């Protein structure tokens, strides 16, 4: 587990953060139902060469929500403000799941603030195939209802489908993820987040075309929620981007295949 602290930002709002290592900064952006601890295995493997920063998105994990919208554009601007607060002038970004879209938008909007970009296992195209679970959760009414009434179902389904059969999260990590996801205000924010993302997915490819930094689409071959064709089409849109598919890997490969993922990222960032 990563050692964390809660920082009070200039706005007075609280942000949970983990920061370790030294070298060029690398910022890790999580999705849901996780929080920054999903990076626990990857972060320690990158910290020998980089300063690694992971935080709970405002409104998720154990960070306080911020006012305003919930589209990838809003989330990218929150990332921008957080980097300012942390005095990080320029960083590489690694975004997974719902951390991928804000990372892409940030790269397009703030090219002077990003060194390199890694996107993993994310819903990046509105018209590409997803799992039936994601199809349901992309409908705001169903999304809001399921997240409000059946959080254990959502969380347990993620565990079963994000990991290989028979693989389980260690109890301490699982407890941290579940404790944050079980909070009703976190799930309410996630429902809004899903709606905000769904409403802007059609606009995102225009942003992707503006990205100029070196970009790696790093995908799990067996991510059933966002199959590798998302990555292939993303690479066809982002100029000069690179595609790497990890054989047999599933959605949470950053945790259970941390050695492989870390080596791939280190090579790309070198």
Which residues does each PLM region occupy?
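Conserved HGGG/HGGXW glycine-rich cap/lid loop of the alpha/beta-hydrolase fold
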Residues: 18-62
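Catalytic histidine-centered segment of alpha/beta-hydrolase-like enzymes
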Residues: 249-258, 262
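Conserved alpha/beta-hydrolase catalytic His-Asp/Glu region
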Residues: 130, 149-209
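Alpha/beta-hydrolase fold catalytic core
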Residues: 1-26, 47-50, 84, 88-90, ...
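Active-site loop/oxyanion-hole signature of alpha/beta-hydrolase fold enzymes
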Residues: 54-95, 263
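Flexible "cap/lid" loop of the alpha/beta hydrolase fold
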Residues: 108, 115-146
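Short beta-strand/loop motif that positions the catalytic acidic residue
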Residues: 211, 217-219
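Acidic catalytic loop of the alpha/beta-hydrolase fold
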Residues: 222-226
């Amino acid at each position: 587990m990563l050692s964390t602290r809660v920082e009070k930002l200039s706005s007075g709002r609280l942000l949970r953060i983990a920061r370790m290592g030294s070298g060029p900064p690398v910022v890790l952006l999580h999705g849901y139902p996780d929080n920054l601890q999903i990076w626990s295995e990857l972060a320690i493997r990158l910290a020998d060469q980089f300063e690694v920063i992971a935080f709970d998105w405002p409104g998720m994990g154990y960070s306080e929500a911020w006012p305003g919208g919930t589209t990838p554009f809003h989330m990218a601007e929150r990332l921008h403000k957080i980097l300012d607060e942390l005095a990080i002038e320029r960083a590489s970004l690694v975004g997974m799941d719902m951390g991928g879209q804000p990372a892409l938008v940030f790269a397009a909007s703030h090219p002077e603030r990003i060194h390199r970009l890694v996107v993993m296992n994310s819903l990046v195209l509105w018209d590409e195939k997803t799992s039936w679970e994601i199809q349901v959760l992309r409908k705001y009414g169903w999304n809001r209802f399921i997240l409000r009434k059946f959080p254990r179902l959502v969380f347990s389904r993620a565990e079963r489908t994000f990991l290989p059969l028979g693989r389980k999260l260690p109890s301490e990590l699982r407890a941290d993820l579940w404790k944050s996801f079980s909070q009703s205000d976190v799930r309410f924010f996630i429902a809004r987040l899903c709606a905000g993302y769904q409403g802007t997915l059609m606009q995102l490819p225009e942003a992707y075309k503006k990205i100029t930094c070196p970009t790696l689409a790093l995908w799990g071959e067996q991510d059933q929620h966002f199959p590798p064709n998302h990555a292939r089409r993303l690479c066809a849109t982002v100029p000069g981007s690179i595609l790497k598919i990890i054989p047999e890997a599933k959605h949470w490969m950053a945790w259970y295949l941390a050695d492989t993922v870390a080596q791939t990222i280190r090579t790309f960032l070198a």
